[in-house]
Structure formats: structure tokens, C-alpha cells
Amino acid sequence: MCLHSYCAHLFIYIDRKTAEKARIWRYILFGLANQQNMINFVSRNELERMKMTKTEQYAQLIPQIKALIEKQTNVVGALCNVTALLKEAFDYYFWVGFYIVKDQSLQLGPFQGSVACYTIAKGKGVCGTSWDSQKTIIVDDVEQFEGHIACSSLSRSEIVVPIFKGNEVVAVIDVDSKDLASFDEHDAKGLETIAQLVAPLF
């Protein structure tokens, strides 16, 4: 191959490589632009949430939960939707679900989150203790709770709220967080209100 022909092929190769790089950069920049738009959209939603207190967030959910469960005969579906709504609303919720009293133990019900324990005995763990004491329990650090049942190693703090039918506990709402001390009296009040709303389903 003569020098002229070699140079011509070299220029064509360089031009092709340049065009390919330009095409790749266009994809990258276009993708980043779309990603930035998505980030901006998420940020706006997060800012709206940040403006609200926990009490306001729970208050906003109450009418939505009422609408979801009103005259609903599909109990499992209704409880699934309640857990989905709660997990979507609060970013510090790692796991949220129901444990239902059956055969003298708490049986796993509808939930959102990672794989969970199937059965919890009365008086055992945070859920079993809440059932036994008939009280809401807030645990800032689950590792410091005697007899804690570690369904997930990612769980750091927890709140459990009993659901009553008359004077009897028929289920509990269990919520876990990956962070320490995520729950307070505002969560307790909000979840206790929700427990009253869903009680007729049991």
C-alpha cells in the first residue's frame, strides 16, 4: 500500500472513531439530561414532603386509607394496599406489615419489605411483647431490646402498634427502619389511628 493510500485509510479510521465518540457522548449527555430532569422531579417531591411534619403526613394518609378499605371485602388486598401506601409515604420505613393473631401466635400477614418471620409467639420479640402488653412499643435500637427477633439484620429501630377488636388484640402493625431512633410519639399516634381504621377488617 502506498503512503497516500495508507494516509487516506488512516484518516477514514480516525473520522469514524471521532464520529463514534461523538455519538457516544451524545448518548451520555442526553442520558444525563434526562437523569437530571428525573432528579429534579424527585427533589421537588421530596421538598414537598420535607415541608410537612410527621403528624401532617399521617393526617394526609387517613382519608386515603379510609377510601381504600371502605366496604372492602377483599381483606388481604385491602391490607396490602395499606402497607403499600405507608411504605410509599415514609422514606424511613424499611419494612411495614401486619402480624395477625391466629392459633395462639402472631402469623405473618400482608407486608411491604424484605422476607419476614412467619410466626411470633406471644411475649416474644417486639411484636409478641406488644401483643402481650396490649401497648404500643417504640424501640430506638433493636439490639438493645431483650429477646428481639432479628428477621432482618438491616433493621435498626422498630415500632409495633396493637390492633384491637373490643378489648382483645387481633393483630399488630409492625414497622422497621434501617436507622436508629426513627420512630417517636407522632408515629405512634398516627399508626394507632390507622390501627383503629383497619380493625373492622379483622
Description of each model-found segment:
Residues 101-153:
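Regulatory sensory and allosteric helical modules in signal-transduction proteins
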Residues 157-164:
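A short, aliphatic-rich beta-strand micro-motif
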Residues 176-194, 201-202:
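Regulatory loop-to-helix N-cap segments in sensory/regulatory domains
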Residues 43-110, 198, 202:
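Intrinsically disordered, low-complexity terminal regulatory regions
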